[in-house]
Amino acid sequence: MTDRLDRGELLRLAAGAAAVGAAPTAVRHLFSKGGGFPQSHPRWRFVFVNHALTNPFFVPAKNGSHDAASLLGVDVKWAGSASSDVGQMVKAMRHAIAAEVDGIAVSIVDPTAFNSATRLALARGIPVLSYNADGGKQNGRLAYVGQDNYESGLELGARVVRLCSSGEVCLFIATPGQENIQPRVDGALDAIRDSGKRIRIHVVASGVHVGHERKKIEATYLANKNLRGLFAVDAGSTAGVAEVMRKYRLQKRGVCAGGYDLLPVTLRAIHDRHLDFTIDQQPYLQGFLPVLQMFLYRYSARLVAPADTNTGLNFVTRENVGRYLTTRSRFEGSSTSDRYPVR
C-alpha cells in the first residue's frame, strides 16, 4: 500500500508521525518507499535563533529539529541567547547570514529588532521562518510555525473566569513585552474583561531564570495571601506557580492555578491536584516543521513555499495528565529515548 503513496502523501504521513511520536527511523522507512525521496541533494545547513537556549521548554523543540535533520540529511545548529537578549539574537542571526547558511528559523520576540536582518537574509536568498514567537507584523519572514499566542491567551482567560468567578488574581510573565508571551497576557486580559466578572488581575514580571521566577511568585503570594488565583503564561513561571501551590497547599485554601507547557514539575502538580491545568503548544513540532519546510523550499527550487502552521492548543488537566506522566519520551522532552507507538 505504501508503494502507491505520492510524495505529498508521504510528507503528510511524516509530519503526522512526528506529531504522534513515530521515531525518525520509522518515518524514514516511509520515504524509502516513495520512489527514492529524497534524492541526492546538498547537505543544507539550517540555523535556529532562539531566545532561551537553556530553558527546558525547548528540549523537545531541539529534538524535533534534529530528528527532521536526520530524516532529511541536513544539518541544524541552535544559536542565540539564554536570557532573551535581543541584541545577542540579532548578532547570531547576522552571523548565520554571513556564514551563508541555507535557512534560518528565528523566534521573533521583538516587534522590530529582527526586521533588518530578515530583509538582509531574504535579499541573499536565505529563507527565514519564525517559530514559537511571531512578533512584528512588518517582519518579512516567510511563515510562522507555532501556537497562536493571542488566541491561546483568550482560552487561558476563559479558563480563569471559569475557575475564579471573582477576587484578585495574579498573572505571571517572565519578560513583559516579549512577543512569544505578551500576546497571551493580552488575550487573557481581554477575555477576563469581556466576561464582566469581578476579577481584579495583577500582571507580575517574574524574570527569565526559573529559580528566580519561583522566588518572585512566592514573594508575591506572601505579600497578598488573599489571592484567589495564580496563573502564568510561560513554562518557568508555571513551574514556579506549581511549586508555590504545593509548598503552601493553596488548593486546600481555594486558590486556583494554571499555566503553560509540560515541564515535569508542572505535570506532577496537576496529577497531585496542586494545579488545575496547563496548556500544551507541542514544542516538538516547533522544531521539526521549520526544518521540513526549509528543506522543501530548497529541495523544490523554491516552488514549495513555507506555510503558516498552528501547532495547536491542548489543555492538560487531571483527566488526561496520566499519559504524559507514564509515557516519557523525547517528543515531550521528558526522556532521551524514542517511545513509539504511543497508545
PLM regions and their residue ranges:
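Signal peptide-proximal N-terminal region
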Residues: 63-80, 194-196
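N-terminal secretory signal peptides and thylakoid transit peptides that target proteins
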Residues: 1-18
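Hydrophobic alpha-helical
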Residues: 106-122, 188, 206-269
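Hinge/cleft segment of the Venus flytrap/periplasmic-binding protein
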Residues: 31-42, 180, 191-192, 288-343
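Flexible loop/hinge segments that line or gate small-molecule binding clefts
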Residues: 112-151, 162, 168, 263-271, ...
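Hinge/beta->alpha junction and helix N-cap segments in small-molecule ligand-binding domains
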Residues: 49-62, 78-89, 110, 133, ...
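Short, hydrophobic alpha-helical segments
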Residues: 97, 160-165, 221, 290, ...
